[in-house]
Curated annotation (Swiss-Prot):
Effect of residue 6 to A: Small decrease in cytotoxicity towards Jurkat cells. In r-R6A-R7A; 1.74-fold decrease in cytotoxicity towards Jurkat cells
Organism per entry: Hottentotta tamulus
Name this protein carries in UniProt: Potassium channel toxin alpha-KTx 5.4
Distribution of this protein across tissues and organs: Expressed by the venom gland.
Domain notes: Has the structural arrangement of an alpha-helix connected to a beta-sheet by disulfide bonds (CSalpha/beta).
Keyword Secreted recorded: yes
PTM annotation (Tyrosine amide): residues: 31
Subcellular location: Secreted
Its job: Blocks small conductance calcium-activated potassium channels. Shows activity on KCa2.2/KCNN2 (IC(50)=0.0243 nM), KCa2.3/KCNN3 (IC(50)=1.7 nM), and KCa2.1/KCNN1 (IC(50)=42 nM). Induces cell death when tested on human T lymphoblastic leukemia Jurkat E6.1 and human breast cancer MDA-MB-231 cell lines which constituvely express KCa2.2/KCNN2, but not on human peripheral blood lymphocytes (which do not express KCa2.2/KCNN2).
Molecular functions per Gene Ontology: ion channel inhibitor activity; potassium channel regulator activity; toxin activity
Amino acid sequence: AFCNLRRCELSCRSLGLLGKCIGEECKCVPY
């Protein structure tokens, strides 16, 4: 599976975090 940055950003934003694609993984990181 490949990381969809848009979807990653949206799901992380609901947690108050910033979404980043690291390789094929979505990571939620603090701003």
